[in-house]
Curated annotation (Swiss-Prot):
PANTHER family: LARGE RIBOSOMAL SUBUNIT PROTEIN BL17M (PTHR14413:SF16), RIBOSOMAL PROTEIN L17 (PTHR14413). Keywords: Ribonucleoprotein, Ribosomal protein. It comes from the Bacteria. InterPro entries: Ribosomal_bL17, Ribosomal_bL17_CS, Ribosomal_bL17_sf. GO terms for biological process: translation. Pfam families: Ribosomal_L17. Belongs to the bacterial ribosomal protein bL17 family. Coiled coil: none annotated. This is Large ribosomal subunit protein bL17. Part of the 50S ribosomal subunit. Contacts protein L32. GO terms for molecular function: structural constituent of ribosome. PROSITE patterns: RIBOSOMAL_L17.
Amino acid sequence: MKHRVVGRRLDRTTEHRTAMFKNMVTSLFRHERIVTTTPKAKELKRFADKVITQAKRGTPHARRLAHRNVRDVEVLNKLFDTLAERFKARPGGYTRIVRVGRRAGDNAEMSVIELVDRAPAAAPEAEEKGEKKAAGKAEKAPKAAKAPKAEKKPAKKAAKAE
């Protein structure tokens, strides 16, 4: 029975798991959106929300506590300056998980984890490329429907019937 057991092991050692989540939290705050597997995203949400809550306090002690998880000074400054101000009025729920399908190599369920009040200018180029591909497919579809095939008459069946 799993009484009072919190969190996922994700088939990693404790050191690997904590280092991975520290790196993922730093990447999430740097890019404001990352793509990862769904179990990692669900676990990362816990870390990220706690760090943002610490940043909202704005005290030197809160900065030291956040520095345990966010090891990059630039990202830490961004967290305490811009992100803390952005989420000042929000009582919680700073991140959103959106499922995007399955990964081609191992069929793992993938998700996008992003900050809720994300700036629209911070959109990655991958989305723009995806939109261009979708538009290209839509343009090709009418060309295929342009020339319908002529119906073939069953000549052999008519010849056998006579």
